[in-house]
Regions:
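Cyclic nucleotide signaling catalytic output domains
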Residues: 39, 66, 80-81, 87-117, ...
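Conserved phosphotransfer active-site motifs of two-component signaling proteins
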Residues: 54-55, 97
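A structural signal for short, well-ordered beta-strand segments
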Residues: 1, 47, 86-90
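Conserved long alpha-helical elements within nucleotide-processing catalytic cores of c-di-GMP signaling
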Residues: 4-34, 40-44, 48-49, 55-65, ...
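A structural signal for hydrophobic residues in beta-strands of small regulatory alpha/beta folds
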Residues: 50-51, 92
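Short catalytic/binding micro-motifs of nucleotide second-messenger systems
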Residues: 31-36, 68-81, 112
Length: 132
């Protein structure tokens, strides 16, 4: 998961505002995913989520839709107001894939969303192909 246009937050409003948006994003992620799921910040404006026991593709879609909706919002304080959205790349675990394969597949799907529309999600084609 990547925040859309986050660089502008830091560039226009400063790193304190950016840090506040990142902290609030973490709280939103925690509130949307189940207690059995795992979410964390990788760095910058990039987050990773592990959704445990997703029953099927539709369950992952529902989770992604909730996340996109919850993160498409205006963050405000006395000093600033900025609207941020999120793009998400999804890769279902089939079994046997390495973390590198899963990460690369999700990253490709994420950047396809960012390239074509932003504020949405896309499933990866496959994570089973070897990483070169």
């Amino acid at each position: 998961l990547d925040l859309d246009h986050f660089k502008e937050v830091n560039d226009q409003l400063g790193h304190m505002a950016g840090d506040q948006v990142l902290q609030e994003t973490g709280l939103i992620l925690k509130s949307v995913v189940r207690s059995t799921d795992l979410s964390g910040r990788l760095g910058g404006d990039e987050f990773v989520l592990f959704i445990q026991n997703a029953a099927d593709r539709r369950g992952l879609e529902r989770c992604a839709e909730k996340l996109v909706s919850a993160l498409n919002r205006t963050f405000s304080s006395a000093e600033y107001s900025v609207t941020v959205s999120a793009s998400i790349g999804i890769v279902p675990v089939q079994g046997g894939e390495s973390f590198a394969q899963l990460y690369e597949a999700a990253d490709k799907a994420l950047y396809e969303v960012k390239r074509t529309r932003r504020n949405g999600y896309q499933f990866a084609a496959s994570a089973a192909e070897p990483v070169l």
